[in-house]
Structure formats: structure tokens, C-alpha cells
Amino acid sequence: LYVAFIAYTPPEKIRTSLSKRDNLNDDDWVAIDLDLFGDESLIYGIGANPSGVQIDGRSGFRFDTSLDLIFDVKTSTTDYGYIVEFAIPFSSLRYSVGKNQDWRVNFKRGYTTDDELVHHVVWASQIQGIECQSCQMAFLNGIEPPKQEADNIEYIPSLVAGYSEDFNNDSTSDNIEPSLFIKYPVSSVDLLEIAINPDFSQIESDDIKNDVNTVNALHFREKRPFFSEGAELFKFHSERGYINLFYSRTINDPSVAVKYTGKIGKTSYGVIS
């Protein structure tokens, strides 16, 4: 799926930076929202700033950036603004199988200097008390996505080795921990993921939180890829945001983990063990 934005603005007003992924709070940016099932069960948000820094996640009551998709971005600056081009593999997306599909879509652009957010679809009806923004999205008609093939299996092996030496006792020890992550698209909708002896030590560290004299247990955002895919199935909306049915951070050091997510009609399901 190819998407391109031509953003018109005086070059001297462009605000952009090279930062870590999903951190575009102080930059200009463009993005696309994709509701591939047309029922608001999963809305992808994919964007970038003029420097090519990516942002992606699940759109909804709040934008959840724990989901990291694989896609390419190419940017360029012109004398009339900037251009951002996206190349999004269908293998990175979950969608229904069939011809002549209608996907819901919205295009967005953020202006940092003017503190503005521009949508292709204007939410005028929200002023009238209609809170459902995603169900008012525009349509891409006649989409014929390819069927997910079994040879699109993704393997991510890793090996962590450690060596220590105790000079006081004149002893040494070493440790080798292999691990393997398998992502198997059973179909365009169903996804099987297997993690064998997963190593989460390379995941970005958590933000520091105050745990002194707190009434409730601290809640940390899930950053591990195995648990972020399909995370929307284990939470539901409330008036104050998301309510988690399952807090995956309580799973600390599994030997083997298996997850299967899919969709039948308008019913989404997920099983994790």
C-alpha cells in the first residue's frame, strides 16, 4: 500500500527533528488512519515527520503506540514544503479476505508552529454530541488486498551470552540464552505467534514512577512486541479510557508463550498461553 503526502508550508516554518520512534510531539507530521474491517475493532495509525521519524499504533479513545509495524518512509523538503511517502506491506496489516473491499480511511496533518491538527474528514457531527469519529471516516473503494501466504513466516532468533569472573574466589561463570520468536500469518485475519525462551532484556526500559505510599499498584505500558500485537482484544472502552482485562506485565520470564488472534465475521478473539 503506497501513500504520499505533499505538505504545503513555508520551509522556514517546518519543525522537525531526529528523535526516537513514536516521539513527534514537537514536530510537524502527517499520518493516515486505516480501518480495514470497517467496524472500528482495529484502526491502524501510521505517520512520520519531515525527517522520516516514524510513528504508528492503534487509534481509538487514546493513541496506543505499543504496536510497531514494519513499513518504509521516504521524505524530502522542497521550496514549497515537504513530501512524505509511505510504503506499507500488506503483510504488516490484518484485514478481511475478499475482492472489492471498502476500507475506511482518514488523512491527518499536524502543524506544530500553529498548534493545529487538520483532518481530511471534519468531525462536525461531534459538536452535535456524536462521539464516534472513526465511523465517519472516508472510504477507499475497490481495494483487492493479496491473501496472506504461509511463506510470510517471520523468524527472529536471538542469542544473549554473559561471562563473569569472581577475583575473590578465583572462579568464573558463563551463561548462554538462545531464544526464538515466530510470527505465522495463518490467514489475512488470523495470526499465530510463538515465543521460545524469549529475552526481553533488550526492550526499552520503563519510565521512572514514584512507588512510595501509593494506594494502587503501578501500571507500566507494555513494550514487548509479543504482547503488543492484538492487545486491543484484551481491553475495552469506558468513559474514562481503556480498561484492561489482562495486564501482560505480570508475565515476567516465560519459557514458552503462544498467542493466537483472529476474527470471524464481526467477532474478534484472542487466546494467549
PLM region descriptions:
Residues L1-S273:
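Structural preference for beta-rich elements and adjacent junctions enriched in aromatics
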